[in-house]
Structures are given as structure tokens and as C-alpha cells.
Amino acid sequence: MFNVHSVEIEWAGRPLKLETGKIARQADGAVLASYGETVVLATVVSAKSPKPGQDFFPLTVNYQEKTYAAGKIPGGYFKREGRPSEKETLVSRLIDRPIRPLFPEGYKNDTQVVVTVIQHDLENDPDVLSMVAASAALTLSGVPFMGPVGGARVGYINGEYVLNPHLDEMDESVLDLVVAGTQDAVLMVESEAKELNEDVMLGAVMFGHRGFQPVIDAIIKLAEVAAKEPREFEPEDHSALEAEMLSIAEAELRDAYKITQKADRYTAVDAVKAKVKAHFFPEGAEPKYTNEVIGAVFKHLQAKIVRWNILDTKSRIDGRDLETVRAIVSEVGILPRTHGSALFTRGETQAIVVATLGTGEDEQYVDSLTGMYKERFLLHYNFPPYSVGETGRMGSPGRREIGHGKLAWRAIRPMLPSPEQFPYTLRVVSEITESNGSSSMATVCGTSLALMDAGVPLAKPVAGIAMGLILEGERFAVLSDILGDEDHLGDMDFKVAGTEAGITSLQMDIKIAGITEEIMKVALAQAQNGRKHILGEMANAITEGRSQLGEFAPRIEVMTIPVDKIREVIGSGGKVIREIVEKTGAKINIEDDGTIKIASASGKEIEAARKWIHSIVAEPEIGVVYEGTVVKTADFGAFVNFFGSRDGLVHISQLAVDRVAKTQDVVKEGDKVWVKLMGFDERGKVRLSMKVVDQATGKEIVGDKKAEGDAAAE
């Protein structure tokens, strides 16, 4: 019934198995992949023909995690998986980026890749395995795909590169880098690092590239016995059309791309495009080409002309040379009622970034396959259509917004203070108000500024820069701080973020073979210069976290109590802690280890709550004077409530220096009095004295030896 083929290799100390022919046989390609005991199913389906009028390649990648894979039942009312989680969205993008460039130009058939995690061993992250499985499924499917692609994770532990570290090993690693590519070229890099230099980062990329070669060999071996017949696909040859269009439009298009202002340049390009269309769609005649073909060839021609201009003249669309970064303006404190804010403008790219400080209650609970955890740093990136002068959909964030936000998050996170040093939950929102290239890196810069404005003690400021690279034969040009128009015409786009000392995040997308390690080294060195220049410009606004929090930010005080006292602070059914919160107005968060965080915008509220908790858990000290309230009087003395909920007896002989005939002559119920703790009797009862304390000032009476002696004798 089944025609099963499989291949198995040992990879980084664990078995990797790829199997096809048993599951999902109606898909064009399906591979069941396992690594260790983590298992994913990857499927590929591609339509037999493109939709009429389709002018782009509709590739969709869906990565999904099933909770049963880790022996869990989903939370929530419906108890089933719902909308994609942040990780599912990010891994979908991670798979998409290296495979998309390997489909032939002109292939426009609707194509869907679905990768499902069906078992998780809690040791091997399924993201890299999913990339491998998707690549294998595409290679077997018969769909035109110039793969296969391999992928690997690289850690850096104790100065050594580690291939595919286990999840628990990642806690020790100062690098989390995922790299994907073919036998000949690196195609994609995604990473987070703790201030590593360019050589270490590039070394990790090349180490990973070498590390996944056995995987590519295994996919090829499987394809030799299990691949379907390749589909016939002959890309349309538009070279004659392009040559004709070039003769009509080259001069005017070159002139248009000398205009430095974006809006004026677009107007000029549109005029050239209109002229081209008028030529190929004459009135009264049957057009030779479709509107989609003319548009695609014109777009290709635009890219060619810009590339030629840059390589020939070393001058960019906006008049800059290859290394110059656009003019930068950094401002902080632009929204004084927020906790921290910044406006970062670089050329025609601009971001308003706002930081908000919260308490432990504001941490985000993340329910992942590996277990529930709390996230104290949140970064949300918004890209409204007006930022590029367009209308469009507004609503929940798309994949791009989630991906850009996570890139900036990775760049900033290594520089954040520890929870012990700064016990706040941090939320940053980046509103892109203008965009002409690299809004994600503007978010990195703006986030660094806004956090410092909020008083967050970042280890160092962080800046980011987007780079491009153009390669034609032996000639290449590296572009610093690329424009939106330069974003798609390059052969390598990469974004680097970090401090003066090193890189905290690196993202690369390489579209062609031939970009060598040496070329990447040159590109990273140029990016380092650009990053340091941007950091210098940011320093004009702020260089470190403010010493004081903003006026409207909450204050948090941390105290620690014995674990066995937690129940007393919480009280039966939470009665005590609720009363403290209601009476003081402070927010209180109690951890299992006895750490208590008290938060409020008012210092008085924090102090009141702290004293209350202290009075519950602390023991009164002999010889210390306390303020108390008389709660009951008797013939033999008065009972005084002091030190929170403690009660003690002031014997009638200790009420005053002079002899007292009747307790009520000195105190009445409800009176505020000062008492000194003299000790405990043989039954452990508290002994208090009023006569050794000045009741007007609350200070102990010094030098009254008789009073002291009398008190001690009682």
C-alpha cells in the first residue's frame, strides 16, 4: 500500500531522518522529518497553472505547532489551536526567506508549504528541522525549485562554535544564529548575539554553512529515489521586449533616478512608464503584450538601470556615495506625560517610539510547547499605510510587522538590565510615521533612545543600519543605509544592529550565488562604520539611562521575606494582601522565592505597603521603641497593639514614672502611645513599658536610671 523511502544520517550527535511515501500522499510533496525525537510533517502543493492576470509569485508558508506534540491540551475556552502564535509567524518567515529566491523568475503558480510540528522532545527546537523538511518536500514535489536548501543553528559557548545546540545549552550561549543556504551559497541568516565582533559572526555563518552540507546530501539522496518528475516550466523570454523598451526609456529613466526627492522621482518614473505603455499599447491596434508583462519588464529595467548607475558612478539614487548615511535627527522626551519617548528621523524614514514601564502584573504569559514562561520585554512595531503615502488596511499586525518588531527586540534585549537591577516590565511601541528604507533599524535606534529617556539603565546604546550589496561579475558595491528603492534591487540585503563594542543582531538575505566570505567581510566592516556613525548622532540626544524615572512612571521597591512567611502576607483566601492593596493603593507582586515587588507612582504608598508587610513578617526587637494603640485596659495595665498585628501588655507599674492607682487615669482605649519592648516573660508574652519613653516625642528617656531599673525589675 505504501511506497516508503527514507534516508537517515547522524547530524551533530543526533539522528536526522527524512521519510516520504506514507503520509500525505495526495500533496505534491510530503516529508516526515525527525531530529532526536522531535518530528515535523512538511507538505507542498502547487497549482498546475497560474491564475489569469497573476503578476507575482503567490507563495505561502504556514508553520504550525500542535500542543499534542508536547503532551498538552490548549488553554482557553475552546481547547483547540487558534490564530498563529508569534513563534509560528516568525518560523513561517524563517522558512519562506531561503526558499523564495530559489523559484524560477516568472513562476506564478499558487504554492503553499505547510509544516506541522507533531512531536516535540523538548530538546531540539523544531524550527531548523522544519526548514530542512520544507526544503526536502519541495525537492521531491516536482515543482520548479532550484534547491535543496539546508539549515542549521549555531551557538557560541566558551569561545567555541556549537552546531545545533540543545535547548538547555542555549542558556549558556552568547549567540543564537540560524543560517540556511544551498551547497554553494548562504541564503539567509537570523541571529541574536551578546556584543560579538564581525569576525565571530561571520565565522558562525560559515561554520553553519559547512555544518548543514550533510543535510543537503541526504535530501539529494532521497530525491534520487523518490522525487516526482519535474513539471514542465519554461520561463518566458522577454529579452527582445526589454531591449526595445531600453531603447525607448533608458535615457529618461536614468535622468529620473538622478532626482533625489522620493516623491518627485516617483512622478518622473511614472511619466516614463506612461510613455512606455503608450508605445506598446497604441490606440486602435491589437497590443502585442499584456499589461502585466509590460509592468514586469519595466520593473526589471528599473532595477538594471539603478544597478548600472551605482556600479558605474559609485553614486546613489539620492546623490549619496556608497558609504554615507542619511542625515539623522534624534530627539527624546517628545511626549512628556509618557514614561519615555523618542523621535528618530533618518532621511525620509522616521519613527515615534514610546516606552512604558510596568510591574510584574504586566508581564506577558507565553504558552509555548516547552512550557509557560513570562516575558518582561515587549516590543511592538506598527507600519501604517500613511508612512509611505498610501491608503491601506489597518488592524492586527501582519507577518512583516511581527518580524520587524522581533528583529528590533533581538537587537535591544542583550543590553537590558537584569530583573534584579531594574524590576520593571518594559513595553516599547514603534510607530513608523515615514518610511523610505529600513524602518526596522530606525525602530532599534528609537527604542534605545526611548528606553534611556525612561530611565532604563541599558548597558550601552544600540543602533542599527540596513545595508545592500550589488554584484555584477567581478564588480561589487556595498551600500550603507539603503533607501526603499534600493531595498529590492540588491543581491544581498542585510541589517546589523549593535553597540560600539559589537553586534547584537544580524539579519541577512542573499539572493544569488557568488557572494564570497571576503565580500561579506567587506560588507560587515562597512556596516560597522555606519553603525558607529549612527551611535554618534544618537549621542547628541542622550547617552545613558536617566538617573531618575519620569514623573508619571511607577516606582517599584523590592523586598525579600522568608518563604515560610508568604502565607501570612497573603492571608486566608488572599484577605491580607487585598487589604494592603486597598488601603495603601500600591500594586504588590509576590514571587514563590519570597521576592516582593511593591509598585506605585507615589512613594508614600510604597512606603506604607512596605511597612505593613514588614510588620507582618518581621519580629519586634528588644530595646526598640514602637508606636502603638491602646486596644484594651484592665486593672493590672493596658494592652497595646504595636508593630502591625502584635499585642503586648504595659503593666500598670510601667504606665508612668509616678505611681498609678488606676489604668484609666493614664490611658484609654484608642490612645496612641509610645512603648519600649522590654522583653518576654517565661510564657513568651511581650513586656512593654511606657514610662521609659517620652510620650510627647517618642524618644527614650535617657539618664532616668530609677525608671530603667524599675522597668527591668518588673
UniProtKB/Swiss-Prot annotation:
**Example GO biological process:** RNA processing
Any idea what this protein is called? Polyribonucleotide nucleotidyltransferase
Q: Report if keyword Magnesium is assigned.
A: yes
What sequence ranges are listed for the domain KH? 554-613
**Enzyme nomenclature, EC number:** 2.7.7.8
Q: What terms describe the molecular function in GO for this protein? A: 3'-5'-RNA exonuclease activity; magnesium ion binding; polyribonucleotide nucleotidyltransferase activity; RNA binding
| Role | Involved in mRNA degradation. Catalyzes the phosphorolysis of single-stranded polyribonucleotides processively in the 3'- to 5'-direction.
Reactions mediated catalytically: RNA(n+1) + phosphate = RNA(n) + a ribonucleoside 5'-diphosphate
- Cross-referenced CDD domains: KH-I_PNPase, RNase_PH_PNPase_1, RNase_PH_PNPase_2, S1_PNPase
Q: Where does the S1 motif domain start and stop, copy by copy? A: 623-691
Cite the entry's keywords alphabetically: Cytoplasm, Magnesium, Metal-binding, Nucleotidyltransferase, RNA-binding, Transferase
Q: Short name of one Pfam family for this protein?
A: RNase_PH
Name the positions where Mg(2+) binds. 487, 493
Where in or outside the cell it occurs: the entry states: Cytoplasm
